[in-house]
Amino acid sequence: MTIIGSIIKISNPKKFSIGGGSISNNNFISLYSSKKKKCESNSGSGLFGANNLLGGLLGSLGGNNNKQVVYHPAVSATGETIYIHSVCGCE
C-alpha cells in the first residue's frame, strides 16, 4: 500500500464496493460522503466504526473549515488492509 497525497493505491485490487464508495480504476479507490457528517479527525473513527491512529493522524492533516480528510481502514477482497479516503463536511 502506498499513500500518495490524498490517493490510496491498492497493490492487488479487485472489483468490489464498500459503503457507497467508487473505484475510479483498478488501482485507486476514493470514497466521498453523500451528505455532511461530523468528522472525528483525532480518532479516525467513522464509516467503519474503527478507532485508528493512522486514520486520525492523516485525517487531522487535511481539510479546511468545512471539509476534513479522513482515512478509514477496510479489508479488500484479497484480505489486504487498505485505507479509504473520504471527504466530509465538518459540523
Curated annotation (Swiss-Prot):
Matching InterPro entries: HssA/B-related (IPR008455)
Family membership: Belongs to the hssA/B family.
Protein name: HssA/B-like protein 24
Organism in which the protein naturally occurs: Dictyostelium discoideum
GN (gene name): hssl24
